[in-house]
Amino acid sequence: WKMAPEGLTVHTSRMPFFADRFDSPFDEMESHLPRVIDEVNSAQPDIIAYGCTASSAKGNPIDYEKQLTQNTGKPTVTAAAALVEALKTFSAKKIVMITPYPQSTNDKERVFFQGNGVEVIEDESIIIDDAQLKFKNMNKIPTDLLIDRSVSLGQAENVDAVILSCCDMPTLDAIPIIEDAIGKPVTSSTQALFWRAIRTAGILDPIEGVGSLLIRT
């Protein structure tokens, strides 16, 4: 909502995620897609955004978007594809990736990005609570800590951009501060997903205050 231009409404539904109950929680979460699709389609949206990076970071992200679009009947974009497309917009080939994930998830996302032409120079998991190892409390990462780690790693000369991966991690206040500090583009799952959704919907309004990506058309 913070990024929404005047006249745009945002409607949500949620897929339940029970990492402490299932060995493959992302697969179990995706099993709820038919219900969630019905719920969001009841609002007659122009476009649907799939807000989970880890579960959408697979293979060719555009192919996965096409698959979801067939299932939903509406143009559908994903967080993982949005990050890849945002990096293309920045002409960024070498990145630092900051996440609140367990290292095993970072490793999977590193493979995903490298498979899509992006070299992950360094990744870091910010873990402040053991519950994060079960994908809980991702939204508890302090903004000051996120800024500090992003600036520390992102200022390296061989880094083109910084990504903050995880739709549940608060990032919008941090992005402009990090960009100002390192003089390089910064994007996050939430920011990139919103950018891809509104641009796909034909909304070209520049949006100030949440990073350089949303100023671009």
Annotate each predicted stretch with a short phrase.
Residues 36-81:
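Glycine/small-residue-rich loop that forms an oxyanion/phosphate-binding "nest" at active or ligand-binding sites
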Residues 1-35, 103-142:
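N-terminal glycine-rich anion-binding loop in soluble enzyme alpha/beta folds
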Residues 147-163, 168-185:
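Active-site/ligand-binding-proximal alpha/beta "capping" segment
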Residues 71-132, 215:
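Conserved beta-alpha
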Residues 128-135, 182-206:
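Short, flexible loop segments at boundaries between secondary-structure elements
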Residues 30-44, 145-159:
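Short, well-structured alpha-helical segments in soluble
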Residues 65-87, 178-197:
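Short, acidic/small-residue loops that bind anionic groups at enzyme active sites
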Residues 46-52, 96-97, 159-166:
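Periplasmic-binding protein-like
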